[in-house]
Amino acid sequence: MSTDFDRIFMNQSKFGGRFRIADSGLGWKVSTSGGSASAQNKAPFLLPATELSTVQWSRGCRGFELKINTKNQGVIQLEGFSEDDFNIIKGDFHRRFSIQVEHKEHSLRGWNWGQTDLARNEMVFALNGKPVFEIPYARINNTNLTAKNEVAVEFNIQDDTYQPAGDEMVEMRFYLPGSVVVDEDQPAPKKEGEEEGEEAAETETKSLAEAFYEELKNKADIGEIAGDAIVSFQDVFFTTPRGRYDIDIYENSIRLRGKTYEYKLQHNQIQRIVSLPKADDINHLVVLAMDPPLRQGQTTYPFLVLQFQKDEETEVQLNLSDQEYEEKYKDKLKKQYDSKTHIVISHVLKGLTGRRVVVPGEYKSKYEQCAVSCSYKANEGYLYPLDNAFFFLTKPTLYIPFNDVSSVVISRAGQTSTSSRTFDLEVILRSNRGSTIFGNISKEEQQLLENFLKSKNLRVKNEEKDAQVRLQSALGSDSDDEDVNMGSAGEDDESVDEDFHVSSGDDDDEVAEEFDSEAASEGEDEDEDMDGSDRPTKKPKTE
């Protein structure tokens, strides 16, 4: 006869389920009345009785929690119990499995310092003998020694079996001052000339943070053995994050080992693999698009950029038995590679991640290259118009799919003689998500680039051509204005009044003399004019 408990949450899951204790072991299955269809169809979790190691009872986030330490499957957390369930669970475990349920109380002081204990399946942070919190090793993705006395622990948020409700913590840092003696249990080697029984005056020491970092790596199985890697590449140059790393590729993960930092990547983090020749015709780039991005403290790297010499070749053999290769990797990988390095690593990543490799498409610049030189903000780089996206390298790396592009605007950079040799390419995104401007592109590339974008059914607007069309239409309208028929208004302006007769000059003089006694005759007017500007000036008298 089994014992069942409803509304129990496993490993902080979003949805509750039914927990069962039977003679054969433990089981949990998500409730049929809650969760998505995929969650409901998920197979129940079963734990054989032979896997049980220790069991603890404590207060949790949702009522009371039952923590089960297993022999080979890590830690199982079940919460949602009531306080009255303790006696039932305690009796069941003792009767069925001969295991005592230990009652644990957590420290609620709220202090941020204490002691660390690296137990069998989890790291325990305790204060005065009471646990403050526990971190299962299965939840730790990576750890780095970020400073002399500081260790950063990164958590795995790509585990499909772990789907907690709400926000997740992605990193925690521990400050460990002090130092420890290395191999203090073993006698130090005697120096030359040192007498028997005389101890060495100096002993090798290391920081406490470094010792904790190395022990945590071993306990959490973060640093896999290099011999277990399917294939390894030594001293590969990365432009992002900058440095040289040894790459160990495993069945489900990738390990990057540098002089200062180490990174662990899950295969399902790699969303895209792009292989592009660099414009200098010397190097070749392989870009890995990551989601979620690689983290180094507060810095995130959504793209990893590997650089190889174009003609560099490598010869590697997969670290797999013939049987394992035939069963798992025959259709994905080659048993042995002897080719250019960037081709080998691209093919291996493609086979293990299931992502296709994106390569340059139809576009060719005036100089038969697949990229054009340009600038993005204050950074210079190269824009690669691929068959379905824009790709800008190298810093920052930008990937803009054509599906996200609303239109492309080609505009001149300025009116001076220098800037008229270049133009700007503005990529406007859909749904009012802003735009990205690539500037200082050579004018020689404009027509080729414009034709390529139009062939991809993108809306291309050329501001320079539009301005010329507007100017021509404006000039055409001005010439048409001369022939416009103004109607009766025009005739009134040009008509002659037949009743009006212009009198001669003599009549004018007579009228002026009759009504104005000071009116001057024509001859007098001429004399007055001569007195003015028409009269020659006298030469100055010289003594």
Curated annotation (Swiss-Prot):
Annotated GO CC locations: chromosome, telomeric region; FACT complex
CDD domains per record: PH1_SSRP1-like, PH2_SSRP1-like, PH_TFIIH
Gene3D superfamilies with a match to the protein in the record: 2.30.29.150, Pleckstrin-homology domain (PH domain)/Phosphotyrosine-binding domain (PTB) (2.30.29.30), Structure-specific recognition protein (SSRP1) (2.30.29.220)
Compositional bias (Acidic residues): 478-497, 505-531
GO molecular function: DNA binding; histone binding; nucleosome binding
Sequence ranges of Basic and acidic residues compositional bias: 532-543
Highest taxon in the source lineage: Eukaryota
Pfam family, one: POB3_N
Chain spans, region Disordered: 183-204, 472-543
SUPFAM superfamilies (alphabetical): PH domain-like
Keywords, in A-Z order: Chromosome, DNA damage, DNA repair, DNA replication, Nucleus, Transcription, Transcription regulation
Localisation: Nucleus; Chromosome
GO biological process per UniProt: DNA repair; DNA replication-dependent chromatin assembly; DNA-templated DNA replication; nucleosome organization; pericentric heterochromatin formation; positive regulation of RNA polymerase II transcription preinitiation complex assembly; silent mating-type cassette heterochromatin formation; subtelomeric heterochromatin formation
Subunit structure of this chain's protein: Forms a stable heterodimer with SPT16. The SPT16-POB3 dimer weakly associates with multiple molecules of NHP6 to form the FACT complex.
Job description of the protein: Component of the FACT complex, a general chromatin factor that acts to reorganize nucleosomes. The FACT complex is involved in multiple processes that require DNA as a template such as mRNA elongation, DNA replication and DNA repair. During transcription elongation the FACT complex acts as a histone chaperone that both destabilizes and restores nucleosomal structure.
Family: Belongs to the SSRP1 family.
Note: In contrast to the orthologous protein in animals and plants, this protein does not contain a HMG box DNA-binding domain. This function may instead be provided by the HMG box of the associated NHP6 protein in the FACT complex of fungi.
Designated name of the protein: FACT complex subunit POB3
Upper taxonomic lineage: Eukaryota, Fungi, Dikarya, Ascomycota, Saccharomycotina
Encoding gene (name): POB3
